[in-house]
């Protein structure tokens, strides 16, 4: 190989062909080192060889555009377990995920967020141990299968958002580690920090964000996903361990912050309309401020200020111990001026593992498919789809997947049939959230007012709107109590007939739901809850009503 002035090396191999395997042999004073190309688009295994890959692909007919962020509904999934193959010894692959796209389309989601697919050690993993970030996991089908999957998803009207890991690499099967044999303090060498800045919860493998070659490497990776794979958005894992050393915000890492700014700035410049999402969970509003204003420039961020109080509210065994003030704060929390710069959820891969379980399982450990589990988990889901923010659910949540998430246990699709009514409940909520029928535009709007909160009776009501008026104003009333509440008087923002668009107690969702006699109501003049009109509603136990004009 020949050295270039910028520190890069190159070689022309006229006899090389697509599909050929290769490796770099690096000879230094430290010895000889066999290394996989850090930019390899395909590898045989995480410890094998690089493969010469043709990045070309027939994207003809793929003119997909991501929905506006206030109209996104995200479905997080893990390729290896979402729809496992018949061969139980191997993980699921992209083609097996493709066979379930019809389910997702019918459910109504318009974006899939895929847990990391960069080549990792072994065949089964969550994906957060990337060995080769430019190569698609071969056990999932490799790069061609991933492109085919993305094109198929786009044909179904579904965006693909990819989870990437830049807060650390590896730590196992990591050829970048001491790449040329050099290191200090027995750390990672030229591409990593070689002091305490290298230390993360996952190993001493934090890349050196202050090194130009490393920054370019990570930017090139982001741009590869957007260009070669036509990914519609990027979710950045644990950004608190990029912008700080200890993840707690007390040891800032300026190199990491400027890296995030640069990556987001480049995405916005080169691919306007694509979304970038931070998983930071430190309720830091600067993450979603514009780079020009000193922020990191993310489009949105996962919101710990929503998921934790909502889960706490529905998993608390005794009604009297539920905090409606915490629910109110979760509904109303916002980082900056945009209600949709947060992603809200009651389940994610982290929230249903690491010592935690699926919401129905936590509600009723001995009866996770029972009445209490179904009623209160769907109560949480209703909050996800009616509160301001970008709603997200985790694979299998729509049919009461139980236990906790593991990369060796596939989703139980038999429950899709067994709990078809709960699936319909999710489908109806998503339809309302996206205003598919043209009478709930307010759920896509910026404005929210929680105007009624009765902590003793455990009832909360809030108003959502965009511009206001007919087909826009939405009122959500939620009962976090085990008993029905009849003739319950609350305020309404406008007079006239308010149509009942959704009742989570409908028996069509589950045979043992009560179909409590809730109906359209007429709001009459009379100041109530600070609003000029009022009406009496009837709520089933642990139920949500959605009204609109």
Model features per residue range: what roles?
Residues 15, 78-83, 118, 137, ...:
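Short, flexible loop/turn elements at secondary-structure junctions
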Residues 133, 137-141, 209-210, 249-254, ...:
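Short, contiguous acidic/charged loop-to-helix segments that flank catalytic cores in large enzymes
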């Amino acid at each position: 190989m020949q050295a270039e002035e910028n520190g890069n090396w190159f070689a022309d191999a006229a006899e090389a062909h697509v599909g050929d395997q290769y490796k770099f042999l690096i000879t230094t004073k430290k010895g000889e080192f066999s290394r996989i190309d850090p930019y390899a688009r395909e590898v045989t295994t995480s410890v094998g060889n690089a493969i010469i890959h043709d990045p070309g692909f027939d994207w003809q007919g793929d003119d997909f555009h991501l929905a506006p962020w206030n109209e996104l509904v995200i479905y997080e999934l893990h390729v290896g377990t979402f729809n496992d193959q018949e061969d139980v010894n191997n993980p699921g692959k992209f083609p097996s995920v493709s066979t379930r796209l019809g389910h997702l389309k019918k459910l109504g989601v318009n974006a899939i967020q895929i847990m990391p697919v960069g080549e990792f050690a072994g065949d089964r993993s969550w994906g957060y141990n990337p060995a080769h970030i430019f190569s698609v996991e071969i056990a999932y089908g490799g790069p061609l299968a991933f492109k085919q999957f993305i094109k198929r998803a786009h044909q179904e009207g579904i965006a693909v958002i990819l989870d990437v890991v830049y807060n650390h690499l590896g730590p196992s099967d990591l050829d970048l580690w001491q790449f040329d044999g050099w290191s200090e303090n027995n750390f990672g060498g030229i591409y990593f920090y070689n002091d305490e800045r290298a230390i993360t919860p996952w190993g001493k493998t934090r890349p050196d964000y202050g090194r130009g070659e490393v920054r370019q490497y990570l930017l090139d990776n982001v741009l590869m996903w957007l260009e070669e794979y036509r990914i519609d958005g990027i979710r950045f894992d644990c950004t608190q361990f990029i912008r700080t050393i200890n993840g707690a915000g007390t040891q800032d890492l300026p190199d990491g912050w400027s890296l995030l700014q640069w990556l987001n700035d480049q995405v916005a410049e080169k691919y306007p309309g694509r979304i970038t999402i931070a998983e930071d969970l430190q309720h830091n509003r600067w993450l979603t401020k514009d780079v020009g204003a000193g922020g990191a420039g993310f489009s949105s961020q996962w919101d710990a200020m929503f998921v934790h109080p909502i889960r706490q509210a529905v998993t608390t065994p005794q009604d009297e111990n539920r905090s409606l003030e915490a629910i109110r704060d979760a509904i109303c929390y916002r980082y900056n001026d945009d209600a949709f710069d947060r992603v809200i959820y009651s389940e994610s891969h982290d929230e249903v593992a690491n010592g935690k379980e699926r919401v129905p399982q936590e509600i009723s450990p001995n009866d996770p498919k029972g009445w209490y589990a179904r009623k209160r988990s769907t109560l949480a889901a209703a909050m996800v789809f009616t509160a301001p923010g970008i709603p997200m659910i985790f694979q299998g949540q729509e049919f009461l997947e139980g236990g906790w998430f593991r990369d060796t246990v596939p989703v139980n699709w038999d429950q899709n049939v067994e709990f078809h009514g709960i699936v319909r409940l999710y489908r109806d909520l998503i339809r309302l959230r996206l205003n598919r029928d043209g009478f709930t535009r307010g759920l896509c709007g910026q404005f929210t007012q929680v105007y009624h909160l009765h902590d003793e009776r455990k009832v909360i009501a809030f108003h959502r709107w965009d511009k206001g008026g007919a087909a826009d104003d939405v009122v959500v009333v939620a009962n976090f109590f085990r008993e029905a509440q009849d003739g319950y008087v609350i305020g309404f923002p406008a007079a006239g007939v308010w149509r009942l668009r959704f009742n989570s107690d409908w028996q069509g969702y589950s045979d043992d739901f009560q179909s409590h006699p809730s109906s359209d109501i007429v709001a009459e003049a009379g100041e109530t809850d600070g609003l000029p009109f009022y009406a009496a509603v009837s709520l089933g136990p642990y139920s949500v009503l959605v009204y609109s004009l």
